[in-house]
């Protein structure tokens, strides 16, 4: 390294401690990057890559950005998942001996960004720290540096469970120790697209012990310690806004796995990854940024405690029933800025005068909000606002100190009001009167010299001066002015009197700017004392904002308050999919009931493609989630249990999500539900088994249905195209067939989108293909193939095998009874061997042997016609036997 110049040596020494970050190295008015950083940054930021002599034989790659524009470039890099170390000059270059001393003052990472376009005002920006213990458990600690919020929990499940919880936090960066499993890190980066950082220190840093007073478990303290040490190491500044650590347990909330959250589109759509079109988009009527963040947190973790849910529902009902209270609250909330993040900026020392003005305007609304809520006859409301301090003394302090329209920079002056500080008032008097004297001097000199164009001006280099154009120089009295500067068309002069006043004015203005800055920083320290009270207020206001948001959307969309029951029953009358209904924007939406009594666990749903089966299934899940976050639901009546978990396996359908999963993913998701669901869970399986061959898929689907029915007992909606499975209703007493209805008119299918009892008679797949405008020739061919396949159908009816309790762990394979129906041909149709082989999917004996074509008389043809019209799925076994006996008797008659 000795071959490099001293400055490059300094750069390399600093860079050695920040190998995983871009080093923004301050050189005068620029931040420069060198070597590999320069090459990569030039590409990512689309800026010019150049080079410079660094003392070695080869020139060093270099790029740079102006310091005043650095914020934008840093945001671009962090948005892409990179880290940026900001290295500043920490001594005055004019007084430095040798190379100017430089230090990294902040490491900016995806999880520690405080502001910028990467920070959504209605989303937290969590940094997570994960600690793995020898017994297989994990501790997960999270911090949002923008709000000061800290949480920690202990996790004991599989890696998938860990991923679920990390996903729920929405963290963009995760901190682990240097020995963390590489395989697990790969899962984190591949599944959740997170930035990985390392920190081995786990002791709680000095000065932050008070934040973990309520945390006694050693595992949790280690995770929090890792988190805090990383934050201190990267931020290198005051963390006074950090809030006491909140412990939570995952079993306090409804569990929804990562895939289910995506399938249900709770907070973002699968196709665009945007909020618009999600359930969050529909429910978000919050008026404050912090309310929006709390809403998202509630949606990520629905409650499972019946009493807590009912508290929220009662509060929402209060707002629904009191229009004037709700509207008045909304108007006041509009004027409340982001108290949490304002408190964070105060602690970090980057708050400006406009921020404090926003804080004051927010606090002005608080007394009226608290008073209105205190008048409610509601225990939850009283408990919510208990201990909330309106901070009236802070409001008064800010009111008499900060100007109404302050500049953005705190170094430009004009921040502090007149009357706040006596010395400042004196300086302002001198400055103001001095400028008045300048104006009077200009008028007097014009009168004395008779030069109307004479003017007194000012610039930073020469100070105040008297300017006379060259055309008027002859009118000046000899020796009146002292020449200062010559211009092309004018001369500039000064006088002793002007210089004296200049000194007074400039000293006053400099002192004004400096004193205002000092007063502002002192004021900022006074505001710091109020941070805990402001954070408590923020939580109260956020919760009220979410509850009014629920009330507003419930009123607008005609939702109903759900009744929670301890029984395992679902009663939803005229239920709707809330997002689909909203997107239809006034067009007719067909509501559907979902009535599952205590002893009814499985709905087996059949029906045409694109008829709305998947929408119906999602509808139930969304109604459940809405109920358990405390919101009214889209129905005319709803009685619901409290579910502990939701599992979904929903593929591409109904234009709600995109992409198609592999069969392996399908089976893994099914396994997850089967392994973890309880009788208090909700399972939604859409077309399980479609990713493999017909028989394999049907067998797996039946086995899964039977297992859920017999062993789990979870409320389940199971849609299928395997109409053969509808016979399970006869052997599974807690399973019911339902279908989505459709009718044919003039050869076209009309989807009624209505759920009805019983099984569907057909799938209308070819009709859907017609709707998709496939070629007519292809449609015609499909109809030919369908007709021939229907003529050589093979029905598999597995025997129902009762499994004793002590035998449940053994694998039991039902013995199938195979009933082969020989094809019956009415018309003479020639099909060569090759075509027959292609069309037969049901074994070699059908494709290798030519069947003798029977000759039917008129009576046999009539009976065959009657058989075709019989709907066996609507008949009991006894009715089917009687019908078969009647037809057989008819054929035997002479």
Curated annotation (Swiss-Prot):
Keywords: ATP-binding, DNA damage, DNA repair, DNA-binding, Nucleotide-binding. The keyword Hydrolase does not apply. One of its GO terms (cellular component) is cytosol. GO terms for biological process: mismatch repair. ATP binds at residues 607-614. The keyword tRNA processing does not apply. It comes from the Bacteria. InterPro entries: DNA_mismatch_repair_MutS, DNA_mismatch_repair_MutS-lik_N, DNA_mismatch_repair_MutS/MSH, DNA_mismatch_repair_MutS_C, DNA_mismatch_repair_MutS_clamp, DNA_mismatch_repair_MutS_core, DNA_mismatch_repair_MutS_N, DNA_mismatch_repair_MutS_sf. Belongs to the DNA mismatch repair MutS family. This is DNA mismatch repair protein MutS. The gene is mutS.
